[in-house]
Regions:
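Short, locally clustered residues in the helix-turn-helix/winged-helix DNA-binding domain
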Residues: 17-20, 29-33
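Short capping segments at the starts of secondary-structure elements
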Residues: 22-25, 34-38
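Short helix-coil-helix linker/hinge
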Residues: 17-23, 80-83
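Conserved segment of winged-helix/HTH DNA-binding domains
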Residues: 2-3, 11-12, 33, 74-94
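A short acidic, leucine-rich amphipathic alpha-helix
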Residues: 41-43
Length: 94
């Protein structure tokens, strides 16, 4: 494999691992529909604790699938505008 092929393969692997969970898929679908939401909003919709929801959002953030913004005491999440092609391609399928 060439270096560019290896890089693309690793990027797809990272994105697929981040999305290989029904809760994280639900988060991405929710954010796709609503543009942005707080951790509390997302936790309520996917029926999960704030702590568990934050963990899932952290995984999505680490994979550059979502971005976050601190507003006052709340963290707001939205789909990343700078997604890698692998993440963008998969999100288009959802």
């Amino acid at each position: 494999m060439t270096n560019s092929t290896t890089k693309i393969t690793k990027e797809f692997e990272r994105v697929l691992k981040a999305l290989a969970n029904r809760r994280r898929l639900a988060i991405v679908q929710y954010l796709k529909k609503h543009n942005e939401a707080t951790v509390g909003d997302i936790a309520e919709i996917i029926e999960l604790s704030l702590k568990a929801t934050s963990k899932h959002l952290g995984i999505l953030f680490a994979a550059d699938i979502v971005e976050r913004e601190q507003r006052s005491l709340q963290m707001w999440y939205s789909l990343s505008l700078n997604q890698k092609p692998a993440a963008r391609g998969i999100n288009n399928l959802l």
